[in-house]
């Protein structure tokens, strides 16, 4: 009796198993996916394909149809993965190449698209709509204006540090810059980016030297910046980028000169240079892009070593929704260590509007962002940034970008003797607005 019960249990389990997992072979999968594809039932194509792959059934038409199904559903990450598997089986089918090319483009994988299109015939390029120039080349011009939330916040400035302590304190008032950059593909695998920026900053400066105090309500600093980077597409999905950022800083410095029993203040024109170099590796997985960046810099007469870990997620397999984070560790030779966290959430709100929300926290003083492109080498400290970005593709050739950031600053009196403690800590807030035009060519 016991063996009979065990046999019945095994029979029920077997029936349940076969009911849940229909028996498939290459022929039945071919027939079912073809029928579903002809009727436009893309969900059924994907469902059947997943079941077949789970049972070890894999062939060209299956991957090809699954790629088409995901493509029509707007999941270009999954579409590119299946098209590429089909491409590895048969790389001579022109229509497959066309689908794979546009899946790469719509997924934002421009380098993969360039390398693939380099092997197209002229007839296939014309038929697939591949542009004569490599996709991703552009010229950009941007303008920025930064100003405090409370424009009178320096009116009540007081410093109780004894005059015997030499040092200075800066409070940022306005910041304006213009930036022009060009991105150019030199070959299917190699691209370069070069930009020049001119920046003007005004600060409230309080300085003490040899028992005298100097106040400059509109202290001016001017910067010229050159940024250069090159990106090499190593293998499918992987890019290696190296670059450098050079900053020339012009400002005035007062010093007290003794002449017998009397003295006078002499103003010197000073030119300093800040610089950094970086190396970055990025790899694109389906639905996830990862990046690691190492930055070595010398800013404000200090050496910095910075490491960035970046993760970006595309849950829909396209650019309609994405989010991610950048985790930064910054070490300075003065023994200072800082952790910075930046969060990003973006997506497509309208057919011609993408929006992004950005939140950053951590001491940004002497830190760099976005592969060394943005450098925070001001004398005060930004401790938090909350902002947004609006991206408006006006046409295939023109894109408008608008950025806004609400920033929290922290300023202290810095003694020249680094062994002394910083004093007179002040907190204030500012707005930063940037507008940019990008011409694609």
Segments the model singles out, each with a brief description of its role:
Residues 169, 199-205, 217, 224, ...:
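Outer-membrane beta-barrel translocator/channel fold
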Residues 1-26:
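Bacterial Sec-dependent N-terminal signal peptides
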Residues 180-184, 228-232, 279-283, 309-313, ...:
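Residues on the lipid-exposed face of transmembrane beta-strands in outer-membrane beta-barrel proteins
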Residues 64, 139-147, 164-166, 192-198, ...:
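Transmembrane beta-strand segments that form the barrel wall of outer-membrane beta-barrel proteins
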Residues 147-181, 202-209, 213-218:
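Surface-exposed strand-loop-strand hairpins of Gram-negative outer-membrane beta-barrel proteins
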Residues 136-138, 185-189, 235-239, 283-289, ...:
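Strand-connecting loop/turn motifs
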Residues 107-143, 154-160, 164-167, 176, ...:
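Long amphipathic alpha-helical scaffold segments
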Residues 20-134:
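Alpha-helical protein-protein interaction scaffolds
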């Amino acid at each position: 009796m016991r063996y009979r019960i065990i046999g019945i249990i095994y029979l029920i389990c077997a029936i349940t198993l076969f009911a849940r997992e229909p028996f498939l072979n290459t022929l039945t999968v071919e027939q079912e996916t073809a029928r579903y594809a002809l009727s436009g039932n893309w969900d059924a194509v994907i469902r059947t394909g997943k079941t077949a792959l789970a049972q070890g059934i894999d062939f060209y038409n299956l991957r090809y149809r699954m790629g088409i199904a995901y493509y029509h559903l707007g999941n270009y990450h999954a579409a590119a993965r299946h098209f590429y598997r089909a491409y590895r089986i048969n790389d001579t089918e022109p229509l497959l190449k066309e689908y794979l090319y546009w899946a790469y483009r719509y997924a934002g994988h421009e380098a993969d698209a360039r390398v693939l299109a380099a092997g197209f015939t002229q007839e296939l390029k014309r038929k697939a709509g591949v542009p004569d120039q490599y996709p991703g080349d552009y010229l950009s011009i941007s303008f920025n204006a930064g100003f405090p939330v409370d424009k009178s916040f320096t009116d009540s400035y007081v410093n109780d540090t004894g005059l015997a302590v030499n040092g200075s304190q800066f409070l940022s008032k306005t910041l304006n810059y213009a930036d022009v950059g060009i991105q150019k593909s030199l070959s299917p695998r190699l691209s370069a980016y070069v930009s020049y920026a001119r920046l003007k900053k005004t600060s409230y400066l309080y300085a003490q030297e040899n028992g005298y105090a100097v106040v400059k309500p509109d202290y001016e600093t001017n910067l010229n910046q050159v940024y250069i980077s090159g990106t090499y597409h190593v293998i499918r999905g992987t890019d290696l980028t190296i670059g450098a950022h050079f900053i020339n800083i012009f400002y005035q410095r007062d010093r007290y000169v003794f002449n017998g029993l009397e003295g006078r203040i002499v103003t010197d024109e000073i030119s300093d240079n800040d610089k950094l170099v970086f190396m970055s590796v990025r790899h694109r997985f389906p639905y996830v892009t990862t990046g690691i960046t190492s930055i070595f810099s010398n800013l404000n007469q200090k050496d910095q070593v910075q490491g960035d870990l970046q993760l970006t997620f595309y849950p829909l397999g396209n650019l309609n929704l994405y989010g991610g984070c950048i985790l930064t560790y910054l070490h300075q030779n003065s023994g200072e260590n800082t952790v910075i966290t930046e969060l990003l959430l973006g997506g497509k709100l309208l057919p011609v509007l993408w929006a992004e929300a950005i939140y950053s926290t951590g001491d940004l003083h002497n830190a760099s962002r976005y592969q060394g492109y943005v450098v925070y080498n001001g004398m005060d400290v930004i401790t938090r940034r909350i902002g947004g970005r609006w991206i408006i593709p006006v046409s295939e050739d023109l894109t408008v970008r608008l950025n806004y950031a609400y920033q929290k600053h922290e300023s202290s009196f810095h003694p020249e003797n680094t062994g002394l403690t910083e004093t007179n800590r002040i907190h204030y807030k500012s707005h930063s607005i940037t507008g940019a035009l990008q011409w694609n060519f």
